[in-house]
């Protein structure tokens, strides 16, 4: 079955690519989820429109990502107050990506998706300064330090 991809599909291709897949994969997975359309003459024109729109969106996305990076890195003091287990500095529970996203917003920064945050490990489990990376765009990465303080 010959299809034209409308979205990025792992191990298959990028939007606008014409691919040959097995009938079942196309009919049962790609087409119902809107990841592809059947390759016809009219569909090729539609794909060209999709490509132009994605290129324009990519340019706007890059500019927006750079603005977010400046806003995040411009924040002076991003800190988070959490319950600690005594004087050792260990935390009750842990600090997750969602907590970090909330701390950025509380410090006056932009709203950041928790899936774009890279914590030093899966979770932060101790007080102190921790380096956080925010993947805003494939070409734009913001870095800042989060100060975890015991309450």
From Swiss-Prot:
The keyword RNA-binding applies. It comes from the Bacteria. GO terms for molecular function: rRNA binding; structural constituent of ribosome. GO terms for biological process: translation. Keywords: Ribonucleoprotein, Ribosomal protein, RNA-binding, rRNA-binding. The keyword Cell cycle does not apply. Gene3D superfamilies: Ribosomal protein L9, C-terminal domain, Ribosomal protein L9, N-terminal domain. Coiled coil: none annotated. Pfam families: Ribosomal_L9_C (PF03948), Ribosomal_L9_N (PF01281). GO terms for cellular component: ribonucleoprotein complex; ribosome. Belongs to the bacterial ribosomal protein bL9 family. PANTHER family: 50S RIBOSOMAL PROTEIN L9 (PTHR21368). Binds to the 23S rRNA. This is Large ribosomal subunit protein bL9. The lineage of its organism: Bacteria, Bacillati, Actinomycetota, Actinomycetes, Mycobacteriales.
């Amino acid at each position: 079955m010959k299809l034209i991809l409308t979205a990025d599909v792992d191990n298959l291709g990028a939007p606008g690519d014409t691919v040959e897949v097995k009938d079942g994969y196309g009919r049962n997975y790609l087409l119902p989820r809107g990841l592809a359309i059947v390759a016809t003459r009219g569909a090729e024109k539609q794909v060209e429109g999709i490509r132009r729109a994605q290129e324009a969106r990519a340019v706007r996305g890059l500019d927006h990502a750079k603005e977010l990076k400046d806003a995040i890195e411009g924040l002076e003091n991003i800190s988070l107050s959490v319950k600690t287990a005594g004087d050792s500095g260990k935390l009750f529970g842990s600090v997750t990506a969602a907590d970090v996203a909330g701390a950025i917003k509380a410090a006056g920064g932009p709203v950041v998706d928790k899936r774009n945050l890279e914590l030093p490990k899966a979770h932060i489990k101790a007080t102190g300064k921790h380096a956080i990376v925010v993947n805003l765009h494939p070409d734009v990465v913001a870095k800042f330090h989060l100060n975890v303080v015991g309450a």
